[in-house]
Amino acid sequence: MQVLWKKFQKKLIDANLAECGIEIGVPNVGYNYTVFQKSVLHIVTQGEGTFSYAGETYHLTAGDIFLLERGMEVEYKPSFSNPWTYYWVGMNGKQILNYLSRCSIVDSHVILGQDTTDIKNIIQLICKLSQSIESNNSNDILIMQYLYQLVYTLQEKFPKIFSVQVDIVNEDIQHAVDFINTNYQKHITVEDVAKSVNITRSHLYKLFKKNLGCSPKEYLTYIRMYHASQLLIHTSTLISDISRQVGYKDPLLFSKNFTKHFEISASEYRHHFSINNKQ
């Protein structure tokens, strides 16, 4: 029984909340279909159920997560004796799906037996907010900031480890990634990354696009923004100091890039997500 199912208009290329909802399961009444949505994340909040995909069946309980992606043939249903309740959030957009692809759940499609309290809280908040936002305002920044926070929380807790095959090309990309991960705090550029592995910028670009699906600049920005977001959440360090700690000489440029990246300013991000504000 669907307690909530709200759909939203697609307005942005980078990120959209496509839908969200709440379902209280009816014993042994479930769904069996081919997924047509881009990406839909579900979290079980109570009860039990099963999720079947690619010949495997998983028993899910409170806190477990499953992800549906376009083209998957799936079946999921509540148990008879203890039917589940779950919340879901559907998303689309080039940037948000690219960020989601860096989470291990895009490979496993299920997360079992882990602490997902933060993820549950964000999804429940999105569903709650959706009830007071009209569909023609579906991309309001209030919703968008939590959508980005959801994906980044997933990535923080369940990151995908970039696997690199042992050959000349992938050794270059691994060294480049290691260089960025180690030196993002410094004022490094893509040119510095290319020099560190002794290849041209154009060749470095091709390697990143082929192996990671993003450009070197996008990866460097992602790493800097991720670490900046963690400093905003977990410390009271001045934003100007954070900008320098993640490799920016100019705090104004950092603020501009942060706002572009998250669609919310650094100060607003801290206001909403800082652990100090939750105590």
Curated annotation (Swiss-Prot):
SMART domains: HTH_ARAC. PROSITE patterns: HTH_ARAC_FAMILY_1, HTH_ARAC_FAMILY_2. Pfam families: AraC_binding, HTH_18. Residues 174-272 form the HTH araC/xylS-type domain. Keywords: Activator, DNA-binding, Transcription, Transcription regulation. One of its GO terms (molecular function) is DNA-binding transcription factor activity. Transcriptional regulator of the lacPH genes for lactose utilization. PANTHER family: ARAC-FAMILY TRANSCRIPTIONAL REGULATOR, MMSAB OPERON REGULATORY PROTEIN. This is Lactose operon transcription activator. The gene is lacR.
